Amino acid sequence: MMDMSELGESACYLRQGYQEMMKVHTVPWDGKKRVWVPDEQDAYVEAEVKTEATGGKVTVETKDQKVLTVRETEMQPMNPPRFDLLEDMAMMTHLNEAAVLHNLRQRYARWMIYTYSGLFCVTINPYKWLPVYTAAVVAAYKGKRRSEAPPHIYAVADNAYNDMLRNRENQSMLITGESGAGKTVNTKRVIQYFAIVAALGDGPGKKAQFLATKTGGTLEDQIIEANPAMEAFGNAKTLRNDNSSRFGKFIRIHFGPTGKLASADIDSYLLEKSRVIFQLPGERGYHVYYQILSGKKPELQDMLLLSMNPYDYHFCSQGVTTVDNMDDGEELIATDHAMDILGFSVDEKCACYKIVGALLHFGNMKFKQKQREEQAEADGTESADKAAYLMGVSSGDLLKGLLHPRVRVGNEYVTKGQSVEQVVFAVGALAKATYDRLFRWLVSRINQTLDTKLPRQFFIGVLDIAGFEIFEFNSFEQLCINFTNEKLQQFFNQHMFVLEQEEYKREGIDWVFIDFGLDLQPCIDLIEKPLGILSILEEECMFPKASDASFRAKLYDNHSGKSPNFQQPRPDKKRKYQAHFEVVHYAGVVPYSIVGWLEKNKDPLNETVVPIFQKSQNRLLATLYENYAGSCSTEPPKSGVKEKRKKAASFQTVSQLHKENLNKLMTNLRATQPHFVRCIVPNENKTPGVMDSFLVLHQLRCNGVLEGIRICRQGFPNRLLYADFRQRYRILNPSAIPDDTFVDSRKATEKLLGSLDIDHTQYQFGHTKVFFKAGLLGILEELRDQRLAKVLTLLQARSRGRLMRLEYQRMLGGRDALFTIQWNIRAFNAVKNWSWMKLFFKMKPLLRSAQAEEELAALRAELRGLRGALATAEAKRQELEETQVSVTQEKNDLALQLQAEQDNLADAEERCHLLIKSKVQLEAKVKELSERLEDEEEVNADLAARRRKLEDECTELKKDIDDLELTLAKAEKEKQATENKVKNLTEEMAALDEAVVRLTKEKKALQEAHQQALGDLQAEEDRVSALAKAKIRLEQQVEDLECSLEQEKKLRMDTERAKRKLEGDLKLTQETVTDTTQDKQQLEEKLKKKDSELSQLNLRVEDEQLVGVQLQKKIKELQARAEELEEELEAERAARARVEKQRAEAARELEELSERLEEAGGASAGQREGCRKREAELGRLRRELEEAVLRHEATVAALRRKQADSAAELSEQVDSLQRIRQKLEKEKSELRMEVDDLGASVETLARGKASAEKLCRTYEDQLSEAKIKVEELQRQLADASTQRGRLQTENGELGRLLEEKESMISQLSRGKTSAAQSLEELRRQLEEESKAKGALAHAVQALRHDCDLLREQHEEESEAQAELQRLLSKANAEVAQWRSKYEADAIQRTEELEEAKKKLALRLQEAEEGVEAANAKCSSLEKAKLRLQTESEDVTLELERATSAAAALDKKQRHLERALEERRRQEEEMQRELEAAQREARGLGTELFRLRHSHEEALEALETLKRENKNLQEEISDLTDQVSLSGKSIQELEKAKKALEGEKSELQAALEEAEGALELEETKTLRIQLELSQVKAEVDRKLAEKDEECTNLRRNHQRAVESLQASLDAETRARNEALRLKKKMEGDLNDLELQLGHATRQAMEAQAATRLLQAQLKEEQAGRDEEQRLAAELREQGQALERRAALLAAELEELRAALEQGERSRRLAEQELLEATERLNLLHSQNTGLLNQKKKLEVDLAQLSGEVEEAAQERREAEEKAKKAITDAAMMAEELKKEQDTSAHLERMKKTLEQTVRELQARLEEAEQAALRGGKKQVQKLEAKVRELEAELDAEQKKHAEALKGVRKHERRVKELVYQTEEDRKNLARMQDLVDKLQSKVKSYKRQFEEAEQQASTNLAKYRKAQHELDDAEERADMAETQANKLRARSRDALGPKHKE
C-alpha cells in the first residue's frame, strides 16, 4: 500500500485515515434487516425491515422514523459497513444501484471525487478547487500499481503509460460525460501528468533539445500551455458549464522507444461556429472576446480600435458578458504567455488579435433598405472602415462585395442586389468562416511547434470532446455533438461488453454470453445511415428550392412511426422554443429545432468577398482563405501547401465532413488500448458538495457504469500469456517448475497456480492465455513483491553478516593484541622491582658489543639497498602515474563508448523484446504443434481403423449414387414436363392479354372482358403458384439429394485433405521443431551473450562511477602509505639499532659483571647455568627479533609487489579494480595490524631497555635477584608462547565450527524463509478472517504471533530433515537410474520383438477404444452438464459456508491455543532433535561421499559396457558377412522398393496435380454456380419488380380508360345540352340579343384558349423544360379567363337592370360557360396526364429493353462458361481415364509385390534358420528389417488405396460436372423463357399503350367534332342576328312614315 505521507495535504482528499475507516467499518449492523428502499427525494434511503413479506409486501422503517410498506421486489440488499467508502465498487458484495449511489455519495461528501468502477474510473465534479493535483501527488503516483494507490486520474494515466511501455502498444484515454462534468479539467491534468512523468530524470542537456524557439519553452511546457491557448479561442460559458469546450480534440502525446516524451499533435472536431455571432440568454461567446476587451493590455485596445465595454459590440453581448470566479484580464495574460511558450511570433499574435477585433467590428456593421427599392445600403461606414483596416482590405471593396455580390449565371458574372436580411446573413457567414479557419490555423500552428522531429514509437491519445447536451434550444450543432457521444458510448459498450466476451469465446473459456442491452446501433443508424437524418439533410441541400418544411416532411415520411428512436415532439407549454422532432439518445430524449439547418450544413459564403480576403495585406487572413475551393467548401486550410481542387470539394457539407472526421477518430481509437474515465455531473446548479441522486443515477445507467461493474465481477478482466506469466511469477514457487526438465508454459502455469494458496475458482485457462478475476492479479503481485522483498532481505542479511563477521574478526584480533600487551605489562610490573631483573636491565645492553659494528655495517648496507629499492619504487610510482594517465584516457574512451551504447540501447531493448516475443510465439507454436502431432497420431490410428469401413461404405455409396442418378433423371423429366406446362400457360396468358386488349374498345365489353381476364388471370396464377410449389418441392428434393451427395464428397475430400495435411504437417512439424530448437538455442545464446554484455557494461559503468573517480585518490593514498611504511621502516630500523646497541651494552655489562663475579670467586655453578640460560634466551630473542625484521621486510616487499601487480592489473582490466581494492584493503589492514604489533613490541623493548639501563646502573648489587627474576621471566615467556599456540589452534577450531554453524544457519534460514512465506500466507488469510470477526482481531493477531514463532522453528527443523532426505533419495535414485539403465540396455533388444507384436494387437484395441472414447466423451459432456448444474447449486450455498466460516474461526482459535501449548512442550524436544539432525547430517555427508564414489564406479562400468558393446558390434559385422548370400535377396528387394518408391512419387505427383486441377475446377464450378444463382436471383427480382410495375400500369391504364370514358359521356351529355340550349336560344332569339353578343365574344375567347391549349400540348411533347413554362402560361391564361369571366358577370349584372325578363336565361348561359371552362380544364389535365404516362412508359420500355439486352448478354456469358466447363469436364474425364490406367498398373504392381513378399518371406525363413547359428542378435536385426519392409508394404497399400479413392473421387467429380452442366443448360433455358415472357409482356404493354393513344385520339376527334358543331351554331346565330337586325331596320323604316303621317 502507498504511504499516505507522500501525498502531504492531499491525503485526506484521496483516502481516509485508519481511525476514520475503523469508525465507519465497525458500525453495528444487522445484515438481514437493513435494506435500501426507493425514496422520492434521495432516490434510495436506508431502512430496517419490521415485518416479513406477506402478499409480496414488506413493512419497513426508515432512519427518520417513517414506516412504509413497499413491495419486496423494490427493496435492494444493503452491504455491510466494511464495504463503505470502497475505492473499487466492483468489490461490493451486493452490487445494485442503491449501493453504488450510496458509495459515491459517501465519498463525495468527504471530497473523494475519484472512484474505480471495475475497469474504469468514475469522477464527480466537485465545483471547487481541491489540492489533489500538486507535484507531490504526481511523484507519489509515478510507477504505482492501481491496487496500491487511491483512485485518481493520475493512476489511470500512469497505468496507460506503463501499459504502453510494457505491451508496446498505443493507448488512449476516453474522458467522456455530459457537459459540465469536468472532462476538460481532467484532460489538462492527464496532459500535465504525462509531461511531468515522461520527462523525469532528464538533465539540463536533454531538456535543451526540446526548445521550440528562442523565446519558447521545453516540450513539456509547450504541451501543457497548448490548453490555455486553445481554451481561449474554443471555450465558452454555457448554462451548465462556465468553461465548456465548444469543440472536440484528440491529443496524441508521442513517446520514444524508452518512454521519453518525443512530440505531440492535436486533432480538433466541430467547432461551434454559431457562437461566434449568437449566444443564448445566460451564455457567453468565446473567452478571447472578453479577454481582449478586459483592458489588461491597453496596447491591444489602441491597436484594435476597441473600447472596454462588451455591450458596444453586437457579436459578444447577446448573452452575459462576465463569468463568476473568472478574471478575463488574468486569462488574457495566461493566453499571451501560452502563445509565447508555444513559439508564436509577435506578428502572428498581433494578426490573431487583429482578426478577432475585426470580427467584433464586423458585427457592428449596419445596413438599411433604400427607399422604394428592395436593395440594401450601408447605414454608416465607421465599423466597416475599422474592420477593413484590421483585415488589411479596402473598405469600399468590402462593402461593395457585401451589397452587390457578383453571381455566376452560365458563363457570365452578373452583379446582384442584396436585401438587408441577405447582407446580414452574409456578414454572419463570413465572420463564422473566418473564426473557424483562424481556430484551425491555431491548432495547426500548435502542432507545428509540438512536432520536434524526435524518434517516436508509441503514443497515448487523450480524447476530450463536447459532452452530451440537452438544452432548451437544440440545433444542428447539438445533433452532431450528441451523435459523436452516441458513437463513443457504443465503442465503450463494444469494448467493455461485446469484445470482452468474444475474447472469452476465442480462448475457450467456459463462459455464457451475457447481453447487457446497451446496443445503440438503431440510434446511430437513424442519424448516419442512408435515408437517415444526415442523409436526408444532405439530399435537401442539393435541391435549390428545399426548405426547412420540406426537410421536416421528409423526416416524418421516412422515420415517423418506423424508427423507435424518432419521435414527434410532445406538446410542452414550458418549452420556450419550437421543437420539430425528438431523438431517443442513450442519455435521454432530446428535442431538436431544424430552423436554419440547411444553411448551416451548406455553410455558403459570399464569393465576392472571399477573393478580397485572399488579397489581404494581413498575411494571416490571406493564408486562411488561400485554399478556398468553393462556396460550400469545408476543407481546412493548409498553410504553405497548394492542394489540387477536388471536383466534389464544393459539394462537401458540414455533416459529411463531420462524419469523415468521426470515422477517422473511431478508427484511431480502435487501433489503441482504451482507458475510460466517466465524468459525472452531481447537480445542475454547480453547487459544491451537493449531489442530485436521480441525476447521478441517470448518468450511471446511461454510461454503463453498473453494467461495467457487473461484467468486471463476472468476467476475467486480467489476462496474461502463459510464457509471460511463467516468467514473471515463477519466483512465487520455483520448485513447482523444475529446471532440469522441459515443461510446457501452460502446464507450468497450471502447476504454479495449483501450488499457490489462492482461490482456484478465480482464474481459468484459455488456449494461449490465463484469465484472472478482478483483484487476483493484484494478490499475485503482492505475493511477488513479498517474495522479492524476502529474497533481497536475505541477500542483504548475508552481505551484512559477512561484513559483521569481518568486523568481528578484526575486533577479536584487537582484543588478543590488547590481552598480550596487558599480559606483558603486568608481567613487567611484576618483575621490574626484582633485583636480578634490574641487574639484567643494566647488563643486557653491555652484551655482545663487539658485534654492534658488524651489525651497523650490515644495517648501512641494508640502508643502501633500501635506498635503491626506494628509487625503484619511485620509478614504479612514475610508471603508475603514466598508467593512471592511460587509464584516465581509457576511461574517457569508455565514456564515449558508453554514450554510444546508450544511444543503441533503445534498439537493443527493442530487439530483445522482439526476440522474447518471438520466443514466446515459438514456444506456443511448438506446444501447438506437439498437441497437433498427438492429435494427428490419434487421427491416423482412427483412419487406419476406419479404412476398411470406408471401403465398404464406398460400395454402398456407389449403389446409392446410381439410385440417385435414376431419381435425378426422373426428376429432370418431370421438371421438363413442368416447364413445358409453364410455357403453355405463358402462351395462354399472352393470348388472354390480347383478348383483353381487343375487348377494351367498347365500354361494356371492356368491363366484362376485364373481369373475365382478371378471373382467368387469378386462376392461371393459382395454377402457376401450384406448379411453382411443385417445382420448389422437387427442387428441394434435388437439393437434399445434392446436399447428401455433397456431404459424402466433402467427407471423402476432407479425409484425403486431412491425410495430406497430416503428412505435410508432420514434416513441417519435424522441420519446425528442429528449426525452433536451433532458433531457441541461438536465441538463448544471444540472450546470454546480451545479458553478459549488459552485465559487463553495467559493471563497467558501476566500476567507473565507483572507482574511476577514486582512482587517482587511491593511488596517491597507496603512495602516501608506502612512504609512511618506508618512514616507519626507517624509524623501526633506527629503533632496532638503538635496541641492539643497548642490548650489546647490556651484554657487555653483564659480561663484565660475570667476569667480576668470577674474579671474586663467588660464582656458583647454578649462577653459571643461569647465565647460560640467559644467554640462550637472549639469543632466542635476538633471532626472533631478526625474524620479525625479515618478516616485516618480506611484508613490505610483498606490499610493493602487490602494489605493482594491482597497478598492472588496473591498467589491463578496469572491471577487477573493485576486487583488487578490497584485497589490498584487507592486506593493508593485516599489515597495519602487524606493523602495530611490531611497533608495540618495539616500544615495549625500548621501555624495557630504558628501565633495564636504569636498573642496571642503580641496582648492580642485586644481580642474584635479577637472575632469579630472569629465570621466572623465561618460564613465563615459555608459558605465553605455548598459550599463544594453544589459542591459535583453538581459534582455528572455532573458525571451522563457525563456518559449520554459518552453513547450518544458512540452511535453517532457507527453511525459515519458506516457513515465513507460508506463515505470511496464513497471516493474510487470518487478516481477512479478522475483518469478518472484528471483535477477535487483537486476540487472533497475538495467537498468530506465537504460532509464527513455533511454526518457524518447526519448519526450520523439518525443512533441514527434508532437505537431507531429499539429497539422499536423489543420490539413491541416480544410482538406481544408472543401474536400471544399463540393465535395461542389455535386455532392450529382446523386448523390442515382443513390443512389435504387441503393437499390432494394440492398433485394433485402439480403434475399439476410439469408439469407446467417443461414447465416453459424450458421457463426460453429460457429466459436465450435471456438474455445472451442481456448481450453480453450490453457488447458492456459499452464504451458508460464509456463516460456517465464522464458527470455523472459533474452532481455529481454540485449536491454535492448544497448538501453542503443544509447541511450547515440543520446543525443547525440537532442540534435541536439531542436534541429532546435525549429527545425522554429518553422517549423511559421509554417505553422500560414498555414493559419489559409487557413481564414479558406475561410470567406469559404463565405459566397460561401451567397450563390450563395441566388441559385440564387431561380432555383428562378422555375422553380417556370413549371411551375405541372404543379403543379396534383401538388396534386390531394396532395389525393387526404390523402384516402387520412384513410381510412387511419380504417382503421388500426378495425383497431386490432378487434385490441384480438380480443386481448381471445383472452385470454377462453385464460382459459376454462385454467379448463376446471383443472376437467377437478380432476374427473379427484376421479374417481380416488373410484374408489379406492369400490374400498376395495367391498373393505371384501366383507371385512365375509365376516366376517359366518363369524360366522353360527360362530353356527350354536354353536346346534347348544347343542342338543347341552341334550340332554346333560337326560340328566344329576340329576348337575348345583347346576351348573344356577349356569349359570342366568350365563345371566341374560349376557342382561342382551346387553340392555345393545343399549341401547349404540342410544345409539351417537345421537352420537359418548355412544359414548365407553358404550364406557367396556362396558369396565366386561366387567370385571364377568370378575370374575363368576372367582367362578363359584371356586364350581365348591368344588363339585369335593363333586361329583367332575361334574368333566368342569363344565369343559364353563365352556368353553361363555367361548365365549358371546367370541361376544357379537365380535358387539358387528362391530356397532360396521358402524355406523362406515355413518357414514363417509354422510359420503362427503354429500361426493359436494356435489361433484356443485359439478360441476353449474361445468358451468352453463361453459355460460354458452360462450354468451358464442358471442355474442362472432358479434360478431367481424360485425366480420370489416365488415373484408372495408373490404378490398374498399381494393382498389377501390388500383386507383383505381394508375390515378391511371399518369396522374400520364404527366403527370410531360410535366412532365419541359417542365422540362428549366427546368434540371436542377427535374428533380431533381420526381424527388424522384415518389420520395416512390412511397414513399407502397408504404406504402399495405403497409398494404393488412396489412389483408388482419388480415382473414384475424380469419377464422381466428372459426374457432378456433367450434372452441373446439364443444370446450367436448364437454367439458361429457363432464363431464355423468362426473357421471352418479358418481351411478350412488353409487347402487350406497347399494344395497350397504342390503344390508349388511339382512344385518346378518338376522344380528341370527338372533341373537335363538337367544336365544329359549336362553330356552326355560332355562325347560324350570327346569321340569325344579322337577319334580326335587318328585320329591325325594316320595321323602323316601316314605322317611320307612319309616325310622320
From Swiss-Prot:
BP GO annotations: regulation of CAMKK-AMPK signaling cascade; regulation of cardiac muscle cell contraction; regulation of cytosolic calcium ion concentration
Subcellular location: Membrane
Domain of life: Eukaryota
Region ranges (Disordered): 1887-1941
Basic and acidic residues bias (residue ranges): 1930-1941
Keyword terms: Actin-binding, ATP-binding, Coiled coil, Membrane, Motor protein, Muscle protein, Myosin, Nucleotide-binding, Thick filament
Positions of the IQ domain: 788-817
PANTHER family referenced in this protein's UniProt entry, alphabetically: MYOSIN HEAVY CHAIN, NON-MUSCLE (PTHR45615), MYOSIN-7B (PTHR45615:SF29)
Family: Belongs to the TRAFAC class myosin-kinesin ATPase superfamily. Myosin family.
Protein name listed in UniProt: Myosin-7B
Organism whose genome encodes this protein: Mus musculus (Mouse)
